[in-house]
UniProtKB/Swiss-Prot annotation:
Binds 1 lipoyl cofactor covalently. This is Glycine cleavage system H protein, mitochondrial. HAMAP family: GcvH. Keywords: Lipoyl, Mitochondrion, Transit peptide. The modification N6-lipoyllysine is found at residue 94. The gene is GDCSH. It comes from Flaveria anomala. Residues 53-135 form the Lipoyl-binding domain. Its main location: mitochondrion. Its cofactor is (R)-lipoate. It is found in: Mitochondrion. It comes from the Eukaryota.
Length: 162
């Protein structure tokens, strides 16, 4: 795993934890966007649940604080993830941060494009920059995640505290 270096208290606080092209309009924020229709973890991962599959990635807010992403460490398909535990890492020019899963389940697909083009997380965090797709083992875990308005408020409060 990549060498851990924490460049700022904000990056240190990020615990990062995947979706196919959501077609929602973003809520306006001063430097990042939050999409309506997704669920968000306080560790700055998003989840899009469609049918039996949930896609997971890191939020625009998280990638904005990390800066240019230069490397992504992801697990293999067929493995499993547990809610609130790490499944990979994102290395940027500023820091390396763990990526946590907001839900538990079996990994059914990994975004292999990220190994060649990790910057997709910066340019398209909610579309091309998704990380993993999971078959949730406990779909009720989604109920504990935040909606867009809640997550926007959470980010504003977190940023104000730093």
């Amino acid at each position: 795993m990549a060498l851990r270096m924490w460049a700022s208290s904000t990056a240190n606080a990020l615990r990062l934890s995947s979706a196919t092209r959501p077609h929602f309009s973003p809520l306006s924020r001063c430097f990042s966007s939050v999409l309506d229709g997704l669920k968000y973890a306080n560790s700055h991962e998003w989840v899009k649940h469609e049918g039996s599959v949930a896609t997971i990635g890191i939020t625009d807010h998280a990638q904005d604080h990390l800066g240019e992403v230069v490397f992504v460490d992801l697990p293999e398909a067929g493995g499993s993830v547990t809610k609130a535990t790490g499944f990979g890492a994102v290395e940027s020019v500023k820091a390396t941060s763990d990526v946590n899963s907001p839900i538990s389940g079996e990994i059914v697909e990994v975004n292999s494009k990220l190994s060649e083009t990790p910057g997709l997380i910066n340019s398209s965090p909610y579309e091309d920059g998704w990380m993993i797709k999971v078959k949730p083992s406990n779909p009720s875990e989604l109920d504990s995640l935040m909606g867009a308005k809640e997550y926007t408020k959470f980010c504003e409060e977190e940023d104000a505290a730093h």
